């Protein structure tokens, strides 16, 4: 908080590329331009920036090292909807311009759908389903993914989700079996409690861990 934007952006440039002087300043200005901030932001402190501007500076700092992969952990949380959209558009544009891969972590399903090419769904820290983004959203295969998407508010409040999880609070994942066993509405028996589900790949390209055959799950969801 006691560093200016110039000082914040100069650190990775010095560390990774040993830049200094005019060359350092030029690279800082270029980074600010990439995230659509003017040169005059160099002298500003974080306390003088809005939430969206702070996120843009954070994005610029991440790109300063010219990484192949960037971990984006809840980058749009605590931002209002319009600022979220601006940050997502910026990240999308930078991805197209620079060819960078994002590992995008978020609890916001709409944000994940907007930014991702592939989606990995986790429950209690364990993978449940992986697949192309559009397939996971349109044709969820794992019971937890189905419950998760069914919990999203619909424009029509009379529309009820097809599948609802058991209302049980789990403080930690089970030691054995499926991580979703305590809340799964499609639980089939003791095997769910005792054995880790195998991976299965469906015709839609989604991979899931479940004891129920993936094609049988698809028929249950119709």
Task: List each language-model region with its residue ranges.
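P-loop NTP-binding/switch modules centered on Walker-like glycine-rich loops
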Residues: 75, 79, 83-158
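Conserved ABC ATPase "signature" region
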Residues: 22-40, 149
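Hydrophobic anchor residue at the start of the ABC signature
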Residues: 59, 71, 87
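Short catalytic/signature loops enriched in Gly
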Residues: 132-222
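A short, proline-enriched helix->beta-strand linker immediately N-terminal to the Walker B motif
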Residues: 64-68
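Q-loop/switch helix immediately C-terminal to the Walker
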Residues: 1-14
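Conserved ABC ATPase signature
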Residues: 45-49, 53
């Amino acid at each position: 908080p006691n560093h200016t934007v110039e000082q914040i952006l100069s650190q990775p440039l010095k560390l990774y590329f040993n830049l200094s002087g005019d060359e350092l300043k030029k690279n800082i200005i270029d980074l600010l331009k990439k995230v659509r901030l003017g040169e005059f932001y160099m002298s500003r402190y974080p306390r003088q920036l809005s939430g969206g501007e702070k996120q843009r500076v954070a994005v610029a700092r991440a790109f300063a090292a010219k990484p192949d992969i960037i971990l984006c952990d809840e980058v749009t949380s605590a931002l209002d909807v319009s600022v979220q959209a601006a940050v997502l558009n910026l990240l999308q544009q930078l991805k197209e311009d620079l060819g960078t891969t994002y590992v995008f972590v978020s609890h916001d399903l709409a944000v994940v759908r907007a930014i991702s090419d592939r989606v990995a769904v986790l429950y209690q820290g364990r993978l449940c389903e992986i697949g192309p983004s559009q397939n996971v959203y349109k044709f969820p295969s794992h019971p937890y993914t189905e419950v998760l998407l069914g919990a999203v508010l619909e424009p029509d409040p009379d529309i009820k989700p097809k599948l609802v999880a058991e209302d049980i609070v789990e403080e930690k994942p089970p030691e054995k079996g499926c991580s979703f066993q305590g809340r799964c509405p499609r639980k089939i028996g003791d095997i769910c409690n005792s054995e880790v589900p195998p991976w299965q790949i469906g015709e839609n390209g989604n991979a899931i861990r479940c004891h129920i055959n993936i094609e049988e799950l698809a028929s249950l969801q119709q």
